[in-house]
From Swiss-Prot:
Cofactor(s), by name: Mn(2+)
One of the GO BP terms on file: nucleobase catabolic process
Entry superkingdom: Bacteria
Transmembrane segments: none
Quaternary state and interactors: Homotrimer.
Keywords: Glycosidase, Hydrolase, Lyase, Manganese, Metal-binding
Protein name in UniProt: Pseudouridine-5'-phosphate glycosidase
HAMAP family for the chain: PsiMP_glycosidase
Cellular component terms (Gene Ontology): cytoplasm
Protein residues bound to Mn(2+): D138
Amino acid sequence: MNRFIDLSEEVKSALEERRPVVALESTIISHGMPYPQNIETARALEEIVRENGAVPATIAIIGGKIKIGLNEEELEFMGTSKEILKASKRDLPVVLAKGLNAATTVSATMICANLAGIKVFVTGGIGGVHRGAEETFDISADLQELANTNVAVVCAGAKAILDLPRTLEYLETFGVPVIGFRTEEFPAFYTRESGLKVDYRVEDEVEAAKVIKTKWDLGLKGGILIANPIPEEYALDRAYIEKAIEEAIFEADRRGIRGKALTPFLLEKIKDLTEGKSLKANIELVKNNARVGAKIAVQLNKLYKEA
């Protein structure tokens, strides 16, 4: 195994025994949610993955080591320490070389999962093309990782703070299939609809797993995006959340907040503007993704064992 990687016993034995494993990111713990909801959600996600037949592997960097599968103490540390950096692809070599602590974004988690041989990764929403990117060029590294790294990503679409039409155009340019899980519409994180279409729809986990395996069997590199809408009962009203997003973006512009600080700032501001409703929605959508992601991992694992 790669010298930078430290597998938990649970994950190590699952990989050795060819059991299904699901990667989970840590940015949601350190930068995406406040304490204690962050730790509670992280534990709940792991439990949901187990209940649905797979082994959870929460990924983070602690002391310059890529930890794949965190224990209680490490989860607590990621959720409470103020010393946690946010590591994307470009940050990985520096964080590892300097022995630092960092939460992994979607792009970094995909890289780490791929190094460990984990094929399915569950997150809330991916990063993408930011609003105003035609001037700022602010485009998340998540999109390039989806173009290049063989990991299937289950999400509730892209984060609603982004420019969703341009995000989908970017994914199309780089040949990333955007598959709707029981939906024809690309979900917009807090809402089930965006007015934008996905490329294809699948009806169940078996179909999703077949598409994923077929892509890689063809030798086509890169990921697949499985867009799984937030459950109806937790979805927010589109006009209501859009108003909060626009206010938050205006405030970020006014304060000159850019780069990797932008997304955490916007999520926090939207939480305040919606009196916590956006946080509740965020927690529920990622739990739903964990359910679907674990089931897809189980089916994909079956297909690989049969091959």
